[in-house]
């Protein structure tokens, strides 16, 4: 007779096998009404599943993270139910949960339209209103094959073939529709009311472009209407902040078909890029890095020796000349080892920190390209530290401090850090892994911030720390990384002379702070919605005259601002001053300076911000000091 132990320690005894739902009902009708599933002995199960022995049980409701994930998974099945009713010719493939939502891959003889998506969503709502129970049946393998054969679901049959060890499988019935899944799923469609379909895109069977093309319907689902509304509002705000739209509106960059995944930087965007590069150059110089420059195109034999050819060839652009094969570098590390290898190195020379604003190219699939966030040609703030095993800890600690300071300068205060440790398949002895992992963990602890352990998620050649930023919409962007490498120095014959006058391989620390400049600028654009802090604004001030009589004085003010290092322009058009102010405000220029007869006579400027705040009249020198003070605060300064 099972004794059920609840999370608060209470126990309930039953004289027969009991389902999760029955336990919930024995506790109270309110809990039973909200029961989505259960966690029995730390394993998620359906509400209908029986408990036959003494067990621990947590009732899962929509308020739990697992409950929300189950709701989303069940919504994917509901998509299948609606699609098969509306489009019987469709073939269902897979429908997993993703962050904040779900999708379903479907084969159709024709593309889905937006009208189709609206019809599918409407049918889903009607099915939910029927308030039907979702029925789970553990089904023998042969019967599963028969079910999907009778229904002509060839992709489901392929998935069954992928699981030869499974003797029985879970089939979930939504009325006449049936889907295969490990579960768990909601017991009733009443839990699925707070959902929305969001978009349609293309996909490939098994994610391989050589296979048949599928269509992917995305959606989101939440515990209640309030959460759904908040999500929709956040998505609408994200769409307003789309870096592609803002990039066009502010004349920052463009992309075009003749160069897919390559950025055409316009003057305004290139100014932001240069500010980033100049800032990072000084930061790295101040922290003991030597800046180098390595070739764009390198003989393919180096990539074979480094191991990249075996593991990365399909993402590399290659070329051929004079009977030699070359690759356009997808990353900088092998070239940095070549620089390190020039000349004999002693332990006294270490650590050596080599930095490069390295231009890299990767042959990313065209379907994955996204504005300047996912490109084929990009520049990294890349650096490699060559050090002894004993120096790992200090180098990592210094890098963590440097990285967090840089992020604060760009206005990012919330940073998530994750330590990934040794996988099963790896190079290097355990003692070296022990030392490296402890060095990284100690450095994280010394920073005094929370961090997350990801066991087994490190690369085969060493543990790593990842740094992720949280933007104003709560989205998380992985940017920085520091990665121990015990492999590449061995493969590329990097060595130094130890204190005992012997040869040893240095540890190589791969590190980046911003990552790709292109992607980081995209993040900045969306984080600030184009309203860059003054230090990053392509134009920091626009000087405008009221009438032609102030034109010369306006140009003189612009000249003085430029002499003092400000990025300034004039607007001398024969337009009303209100029109010029509105237009320049739309360009997100932080400061708008107006000159009338009084300002010319007094040698002053009237200053207002892009948000409309009037800062009053001040001397040009006072305004210069104001901007320089704002620039010095970098991302910590907000233009009111």
UniProtKB/Swiss-Prot annotation:
Disulphides: none
GO biological process, one term: threonyl-tRNA aminoacylation
EC number: 6.1.1.3
Domain (TGS) ranges: 1-61
Catalytic, as annotated region: 242-533
SMART domains for this protein: tRNA_SAD
Keywords (A to Z) from UniProt: Aminoacyl-tRNA synthetase, ATP-binding, Cytoplasm, Ligase, Metal-binding, Nucleotide-binding, Protein biosynthesis, RNA-binding, tRNA-binding, Zinc
A cellular component annotation (GO) from this entry: cytosol
Residues that, per the record, bind Zn(2+): 333, 384, 510
InterPro entries, per database record: aa-tRNA-synt_IIb, aa-tRNA-synth_II, aa-tRNA-synth_II/BPL/LPL, Anticodon-bd, Anticodon-bd_dom_sf, Beta-grasp_dom_sf, TGS, TGS-like
Annotated localization: Cytoplasm
Catalytic reactions of this protein: tRNA(Thr) + L-threonine + ATP = L-threonyl-tRNA(Thr) + AMP + diphosphate + H(+)
Cofactor binding description: Binds 1 zinc ion per subunit.
Cofactor: Zn(2+)
Gene Ontology MF term list: ATP binding; metal ion binding; threonine-tRNA ligase activity; tRNA binding
Subunit annotation: Homodimer.
Similarity comment: family membership: Belongs to the class-II aminoacyl-tRNA synthetase family.
Main function: Catalyzes the attachment of threonine to tRNA(Thr) in a two-step reaction: L-threonine is first activated by ATP to form Thr-AMP and then transferred to the acceptor end of tRNA(Thr). Also edits incorrectly charged L-seryl-tRNA(Thr).
Full protein name: Threonine--tRNA ligase
Organism: Acinetobacter baumannii (strain ATCC 17978 / DSM 105126 / CIP 53.77 / LMG 1025 / NCDC KC755 / 5377)
